[in-house]
Structure formats: C-alpha cells, structure tokens
C-alpha cells in the first residue's frame, strides 16, 4: 500500500512555507505530533530546510538502518556550533566508526561493574545537603549528579570545581542551538552576537580544564576512557591529537551528562503524586536489599524500576527528534527522497502515537510488563536510537538512572506543585524553567 504523502495543512488549507515554519517555531513538539497525526510522511518547507517528517516505524528503519548509507548527519552539523564538529555526536562513516570502536571498551560489562559503586557513592553524596521540607530545583540537582558520575567514572576526575563552568557552557550551547533551529536561515559561521560570545567564552573555560586533564593523562596514564583515547592510534600508528581526544571526550561528556539528567528529572516529575506507583517502586527497592550486586543482576532484580524508566523515556525522550540529510537521491518506502532533503524522525511524536500505543498520553509503567521492549517493532520505541547508531552509552545511562532512583527514593519523597512543567526542546528535552520540587525525608526506609 503506498505511503501517504502530503504537505502539512494549517487551518484546513495547504500551508505557505512561512505558516508552517511559524507553527514549528511556536511549538516544536506540537508541530511534530501533528505531522505524525497528518500522514506517515509529511513534506514541508521549514525555512532553509526541505523536510520530510517520517512517522512510521518501518520507514524509520529504512532511514536509520537499511538505507543508512544514503543519509548523513549533515543536518545536525548545520545547527550545531563548529566547536562540536569533530565529536562522535556529529561524526559520519569512518570517523564515527573509528571513535565508536575506541569508546566501546569503556562501556563493556566489566567496566559497568566497576562504575556501579561509584554511581551509588555519588548519588549518596548528592543528597547529603538536602533538608526535609526544602524546595529544590531537581533538574539542577540531577545535572550536578550526572556530571559528577560521568567525570568520575569515565575520566577519573572530581569535577566539583568545574560544575559552574559546565552549567554555563551547556546553557549557552542550548541557547545557541535553539536559535539556529528556530532560524529560517542556515549560516555555518553566524554573525557574532552576545549569545555566541557567551558560548565561546564558556567553551574556553571548559577547554582549559579538558586540555589540562589530557596533558596530565599523556604524562601519567590511568585506567579511564580519557587515557584509552590518549593511548589510541590509527591504522598507521598515528596517535590522536589533543583536539581529537577533546572532541571524543566532549561527545561522551555531553551525552552521558545531559541526557541522563533529563531522564531523571522527567522520571521524578511523572512519579510525583502517583502514590500507587511509588509504593510499588519502594517495595521492589526494599526487596532488592543491596546496590552492591553486579549491574546485570541489579537490573534483573529491579524490573519495575526499568518499567518506570522506560515509560518516562517514552513520554519524555531526551532525544526528541533525529535529523538526517539525504546525500544522494534515494527512496524511503514508495517515496522518492531528493539529495539535500532533510528527514526528521521524532521519538516524541511516535512514542505518543495511538496507532502503536494504548492510551499513549497516560503514564503507565505496567505496559512494559512481559518484556514489551523486546517485542516492539524497531523504531516504535527508540529513545537511544537503534541499530549501529544506538547510543554507545545507553546501558551506562540506564544503570546510572536506576542507581540514582534506588538511592534517592527510599530516603526522600519528592512532590511537585500542581502547575504543569512544560518541556523545552533544544538539543535535548529539558524541563522548561527547571523542575521545582519539595523533598521530604522519609522517617524509615520503607
């Protein structure tokens, strides 16, 4: 059966380019969801981009797997500042494969075994300053926690002195990328502005920390990811430059810190006020008895915790959209894709599509019983992408989130005000305005 193709309509009529783009600028998530509700493939002009929004799993599989050689990350490169150009986040083909091979050993099962204890220690340390009845921004807390975990486990650093510099960098990066996504124009090197100057000033702060650590690893290697990269060579024996090591570390640093902090923040949000789900979680966590078990065994002991995290990822995927650009004329299903067109796949929209999910807007961890994740067709649920491009650190992120939940929830009850927290899409899906919550210490670990 041919795939439905149509240009997005606004107000019952075919949209002008400016109308569709204005809707995209005003509410990116609603726009993506309406595309999914309109057709399997929606063809729309968004400023400088000729875009196909694809909202069917088998077509997404073609783009990301079977025809992946026809597509590149050029769209992502066009909205990212050049300072990230060499990182795994933006790399294609040989460069991406080379970096991925270098990083894989840092995420092997044996490594995760050593990381788990550090994750638990950092989670314990993160809540030492919490006071019962205190109002806190949980997103800020989770950002600091995941920052400490990533820098300690993967880079062997106590990064407490670099927290503020990192927060300034990520906030500036989010502002810059948001501006580029919302712009009808594409300039690889845009005119300087206060926003771009703030970004590069923040990057210089973090670079000073990064290059100092790289030089130290060259003199005194340790058993961490940075030392692995410093000691790595290509096929002819040439070592990575400091810039290449910095780029590779930055990709892991950003993805491991930013995405997991968003996952944890949204998990606390969907749990707030759900006494029934909280009771089930606490019963499971108390029954598990210890976080010292090997990660694979720990995950196996906490199936309901995994269900809760998967459901939070379904409703609030940190990576809410993936963009690919056609490098040559190709096809997706029955539709021709021209070289230069951008294809967008949206976990946000497809995770909430009533064709694939029962009561898609409802937070229901029980839907994940009986190993639903393994039974779903590819690209029905893809918070970490899928196939060869699946996030190299996805197991790390899920272990990190599991241990944080298992450490914090038995000690503190988290409640949020009745106001709805709106998601703010930029590079990731952050909570707009933070995640204000009241933390109340539990009298016993019930």
Predicted regions and their residues:
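Cytochrome P450 fold signature focused on the C-terminal beta-domain
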Residues: 222-228, 282-302, 315-335, 344, ...
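Cytochrome P450 heme-thiolate monooxygenase catalytic core
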Residues: 1-8, 31, 72-78, 95, ...
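Conserved cytochrome P450 K-helix/beta-meander segment immediately N-terminal to the heme-binding cysteine loop
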Residues: 345-372
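N-terminal membrane-proximal hinge/A-helix region immediately C-terminal to the signal-anchor transmembrane segment
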Residues: 1-98, 113, 117-125, 145, ...
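Cytochrome P450 proximal C-terminal region
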Residues: 3-5, 36, 123, 171, ...
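Cytochrome P450 catalytic-core helices
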Residues: 259-284, 395-411
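Conserved cytochrome P450 K-helix E-x-x-R motif and the immediately C-terminal K′/meander segment
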Residues: 19-39, 208, 212, 291-333
């Amino acid at each position: 059966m041919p795939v439905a193709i149509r240009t997005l309509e606004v107000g019952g009529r075919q949209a002008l380019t400016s109308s569709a783009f204005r809707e995209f600028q005003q509410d990116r998530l609603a726009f993506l969801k309406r595309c999914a509700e309109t057709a399997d493939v929606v063809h729309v002009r968004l400023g400088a981009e000729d875009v196909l929004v694809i909202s069917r799993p088998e077509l997404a599989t073609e783009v990301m797997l079977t025809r992946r050689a026809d597509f590149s990350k050029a769209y992502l490169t066009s909205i990212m500042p050049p300072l990230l150009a060499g990182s795994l986040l933006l790399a294609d083909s040989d460069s991406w494969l080379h970096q991925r091979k270098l990083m894989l050993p840092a995420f092997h099962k044996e490594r995760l075994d050593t990381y788990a204890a550090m994750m638990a220690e950092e989670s314990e340390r993160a809540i030492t300053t919490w006071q019962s009845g205190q109002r806190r921004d949980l997103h800020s807390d989770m950002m600091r926690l995941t920052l400490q975990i990533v820098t300690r486990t993967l880079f062997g650093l106590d990064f407490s002195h670099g927290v503020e510099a990192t927060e300034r960098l990520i906030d500036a990066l989010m502002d810059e990328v948001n501006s580029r996504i919302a712009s009808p124009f594409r300039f690889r090197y845009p005119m300087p502005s206060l926003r771009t100057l703030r970004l590069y000033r923040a990057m210089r702060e973090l670079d000073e920390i990064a290059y100092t650590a790289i030089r130290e690893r060259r003199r005194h290697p340790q058993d961490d990811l940075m030392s692995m990269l410093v000691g790595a060579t290509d096929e002819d024996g040439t070592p990575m430059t400091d810039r290449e090591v910095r780029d590779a570390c930055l990709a892991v640093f950003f993805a491991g810190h930013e995405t997991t902090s968003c996952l944890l923040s949204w998990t606390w949000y969907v749990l707030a006020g759900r006494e029934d789900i909280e009771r089930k979680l606490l019963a499971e966590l108390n029954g598990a008895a210890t976080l010292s078990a090997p990660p694979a065994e720990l995950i196996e002991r906490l199936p309901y915790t995994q269900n809760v995290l998967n459901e939070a990822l379904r409703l609030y995927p940190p990576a809410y959209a993936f963009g690919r650009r056609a490098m040559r004329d190709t096809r997706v299903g029955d539709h021709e894709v021209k070289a230069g067109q951008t294809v967008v796949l949206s976990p946000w929209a497809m995770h909430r599509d009533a064709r694939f999910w029962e009561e898609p807007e409802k937070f229901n961890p029980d839907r994940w019983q009986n190993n639903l994740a393994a039974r779903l067709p590819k690209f029905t649920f893809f918070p970490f992408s899928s196939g060869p491009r699946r996030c190299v650190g996805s197991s790390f992120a899920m272990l990190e989130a599991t241990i944080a939940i298992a450490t914090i929830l038995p000690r503190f009850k988290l409640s949020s005000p009745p106001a709805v927290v709106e998601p703010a899409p930029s590079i990731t899906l952050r909570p707009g305005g933070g995640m204000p919550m009241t933390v109340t210490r539990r009298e016993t670990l019930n």
